[in-house]
Amino acid sequence: MIDRYKHQQLRIGSVSPQQIINWGKKILPNGEIVGEVTKPYTFHYKTNKPEKDGLFCERISGPIKSGICACGNYRVIGDKKEDPKFCEQCGVEFVDSRIRRYQMGYIKLACPVTHVWYLKRLPSYIANLLDKPLKELEGLVYCDFSFARPIAKKPTFLRLRGSFEYEIQSRKYSIPLFFTTQGFDTFRNREIATGAGAIREQLADLDLRIIIDHSLVEWKELGEEGSTGNEWEDRKIRRRKDFLVRRMELAKHFIRTNIEPERMVLCLLPVLPPELRPIIQIDGGKPMSSDINELYRRVIYRNNTLTDLLTTSRSTPGESVMCQEKLVQEAVDTLLDNGIRGQPMRDGHNKVYKSFSDVIEGKEGRFRETLLGKRVDYSGRSVIVVGPSLSLHRCGLPREIAIELFQTFVIRGLIRQQIASNIGIAKSKIREKEPIVWEILQEVMQGHPVLLNRAPTLHRLGIQAFQPILVEGRAICLHPLVRKGFNADFDGDQMAVHVPLSLEAQAEARLLMFSHMNLLSPAMGDPISVPTQDMLIGLYVLTIGNRRGICANRYNSCNRGKYQNETKNNSKYTKAKEPYFSSAYDALGAYRQKRINLDNPLWLRWRLDQRAIASREVPIEVQYESLGTYHEIYGQYLIVRSVKKEILCIYIRTTVGHISFYREIEEAIQGFCRAYSYGT
């Protein structure tokens, strides 16, 4: 449907019986009304043509071939001069065959049937509105219980006997046995109600506004009572209050949407268009039918049997009528939601029938796969892997994906630079992967963000913008810190990439959706780009250092035997002196030359303007030199002082891993400061 703002939308809800008739009703030129499916047949086994008034009837659903009726006559579609519009012999309309994708039919049920979604799904809407236990309502729907009609003003047989007193009582084996079909109908119409018809009567008698008022009064009374001191009673009161809130919300919804509650009980059953439940031929000419066709056939068979019992057979016991009504109810339940009442129905090969609910729900259902999961132009999909060298706002796109996504822009660039004279030549250069193509692609990607999305998109961080760069391979590279926002793992997860085309979309991506601008969780406000998993392990390994401490290198009489044993057991062991470095650059150079390891302790000269060490710590050792200068050695640093006790320089005890980690943090802070000063 289309709203007043010309937006296409889909609304799912209950419809009136008149609306169901309007979906499938057609009036032929001779005045005959078609649309009702009365026969459970599909195609004739000899002619291979649809059966009249069957599930694939061409009079109801339209012609199989455009403009050709069941007789074989042909009319030009849309030609106003062609008359008549319907075939006079077979009654088939001369229209396009695509009408069989949306032209519906209907089945007129011989008895009311409850919609299993509203009865059996939790919470049960029918049970909530009627304020009755679900178990009792199920017994009433499936003809296990009956209740007296509180509408007769004069005394009746049951009211004089006091058998019911308007309460649901079991009369399954006591009432129908004494009546034939005609007598049972008269008795039931006057005295009792059972089956879905009883539910329909109760729903039709409801006043939704009175339900809201009474529920609100009861909810307030329960709230004023306070705690009873009994845990079970308090829990029972809380459950009752929650039920009253759900009941009021449900009643308000029915009022707001202008839907009558009795629509939850069906008198007419819509029949899906034939193209949505096809019968196809596989290899060898064997037909393959949709499960929904078999479920529809079961409904029609049982409904026709019940119709015969009510119209033709006057001597049939009332018990048989009730049993047949129960079979019709179960057949409709299986069609709508197979297995909701327990064991699902299976075919001859022990395969579960796929009901209407199975067709539309789930990941492979009609909505998620066909409507919500449509393929989108300028989009791609691939596995994600870690790109630790990437910036937070960048992502790596494989060349194969990038050239497809930006092919239109590359073609325009080739033509503008007069490298190609037309689109065909430009596409041939792209297929041949000439070097100029990659240069133009780099230029195009430099100013064009892309959107990355991982399903399911549960919050706004499920889709973020990135600046793409070309990478080798066939996987999308991501910075590990953006993983948590997407709720993704690098174990085979896939992500979709989209190219924003309009200027508005690109501006929104740059201003609102870039990953480095979404560092906090929109729900809690906590940081969401934090190191996790292998990043924490890497940081631990990088900064673990040598845990023996500075005293481990000291030689004294206590550990003399230890050094001797180590020398004997390991011929490669040498007691190396901890090296001194004047800058971090020299230390990293020594590591690259493999002169030191990542966790080897070393002394790094520290600039005085970077840190002022003021500590009351007592030095572990003081070493004097011949010129009068001396070294004060502490646990993690060393101070070189002059004769006048002035600080000449400071060395800190660290490792190459700590130096690398510090340099990364320092560069990140400096980059943030530059960006902040540029923004202000």
Curated annotation (Swiss-Prot):
Superkingdom to which the source organism belongs: Eukaryota
EC top class, as a word: transferase
Catalytic activity: RNA(n) + a ribonucleoside 5'-triphosphate = RNA(n+1) + diphosphate
Known EC number: 2.7.7.6
Cofactor notes: Binds 1 Mg(2+) ion per subunit.
Keyword Zinc: yes
GO biological process, one term: DNA-templated transcription
Key word Chaperone present: no
Gene3D superfamilies named in the record: 1.10.40.90, 2.40.40.20, RNA polymerase II, clamp domain, RNA polymerase Rpb1, domain 3
Record key words, sorted: Chloroplast, DNA-directed RNA polymerase, Magnesium, Metal-binding, Nucleotidyltransferase, Plastid, Transcription, Transferase, Zinc
Subcellular locations according to the entry: Plastid, Chloroplast
GO cellular component: chloroplast; DNA-directed RNA polymerase complex; mitochondrion
Residues engaged in binding Mg(2+): D489, D491, D493
Binding positions for Zn(2+) per the UniProt entry: C69, C71, C87, C90
Family: Belongs to the RNA polymerase beta' chain family. RpoC1 subfamily.
Subunit structure of this chain's protein: In plastids the minimal PEP RNA polymerase catalytic core is composed of four subunits: alpha, beta, beta', and beta''. When a (nuclear-encoded) sigma factor is associated with the core the holoenzyme is formed, which can initiate transcription.
Function per UniProt: DNA-dependent RNA polymerase catalyzes the transcription of DNA into RNA using the four ribonucleoside triphosphates as substrates.
Family annotation (PANTHER family): DNA-DIRECTED RNA POLYMERASE, DNA-DIRECTED RNA POLYMERASE SUBUNIT BETA
Protein name: DNA-directed RNA polymerase subunit beta'
Organism this protein belongs to: Ceratophyllum demersum (Rigid hornwort)
Gene (UniProt): rpoC1
